[in-house]
A protein has these predicted regions:
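Positively charged n-region of N-terminal signal peptides that target proteins for export
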Residues: 1-4
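Bacterial N-terminal signal peptides
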Residues: 7-16
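N-terminal catalytic cores of peptidoglycan-degrading enzymes
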Residues: 22-133
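Basic/polar, cationic surfaces and motifs that engage anionic cell-wall
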Residues: 25-54, 149-242
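Second-shell loop/turn segments in exported
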Residues: 65-67, 109, 147-157
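Solvent-exposed, acidic/flexible segments
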Residues: 71-73, 105, 136, 152-160
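Short coil-to-beta-strand
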Residues: 134-145
Length: 242
């Protein structure tokens, strides 16, 4: 009996703690958190994120998502970006500066930056929200890649090896479905996209367009199959722009 209870408790521990946000029409179910993916090598180079920036993040969340918090809990989405620059240092300094963006604080940031040599840098703790994708900051992890185009990154073997490893590890850790690994340019179609400002609701970027993300997700799915990480179905698009 004791062993049976332990098995039940272990099974429950693998399940997602929170249901998907209400109102999403075609949300992709979470996957069970299992697999054999090891944590990739990650260099911690954290940007300044003191009490003031945390308060700014909480206030931003109140304005745009209706809840005052800076905490990122139970993320459902992983968003791929590129820096539109040629060096890790320039991107890091931009995020560290906390410069006003679109007239608001906090400044933009991402949880990770992958350099051209494949080095993975972590900038922000994974339980803190980062302002990297309008409408998704409340439920997503942001990964930047140093570069100026999707194709440039797709053809850099070292970057792609690191990017896929990191993303797959995050999928395994948080139970994120491959259909919820998206490019920034796909953000408006995510079933998790929520934005209270009508004038911001259709804002997005052109990094990681859908044709290139199809290639990325196909590679990711192949690796997930190899490493025993449930990839699930998807994507299931549910546009929030309008």
């Amino acid at each position: 009996m004791r062993r049976a209870c332990a098995i039940v408790l272990c099974t429950l521990a693998l399940l997602p703690l929170h249901a998907a946000p209400a109102g999403a029409v075609r949300q992709i179910p979470r996957t069970v958190r299992r697999g054999t993916v090891s944590r990739p090598d990650i260099v911690r180079k954290m940007i300044p994120f003191g009490r003031k920036r945390l308060r700014q993040t909480a206030a931003y969340s109140q304005r745009h998502y209706g809840r005052r918090t800076y905490v990122l809990s139970d993320p459902h989405v992983i968003v791929e970006h590129y820096t539109d620059g040629t060096s890790f240092e320039s991107a890091w300094h931009l995020f560290a500066s906390n410069a006003t963006h679109l007239g608001e604080k906090p400044g933009t940031c991402a949880h990770f930056i992958i350099d051209t040599d494949g080095t993975i840098y972590q900038l922000v703790p994974l339980d803190v929200r980062c302002r990297h994708a309008i409408g998704l900051n409340q439920t997503s992890i942001g990964i930047e890649h140093v570069g100026t185009s999707d194709r440039q990154i797709l053809h850099n073997r070292r970057m792609m090896r690191s990017s896929l490893h990191l993303t797959l590890w995050l999928m395994q850790t948080y139970g994120v479905n491959v259909g919820n690994v998206i490019g920034h340019a796909e953000s408006l179609d995510s079933p998790y996209h929520r934005e209270r400002y009508r004038s911001w609701r259709c804002m997005t970027h052109s990094d990681w367009l859908r044709p290139d993300m199809k290639v990325y997700r196909r590679r990711l799915r192949d690796l997930a199959r190899r490493d025993g990480v449930p990839a699930g179905a998807g994507p299931a698009w549910d546009p929030d722009c309008g």
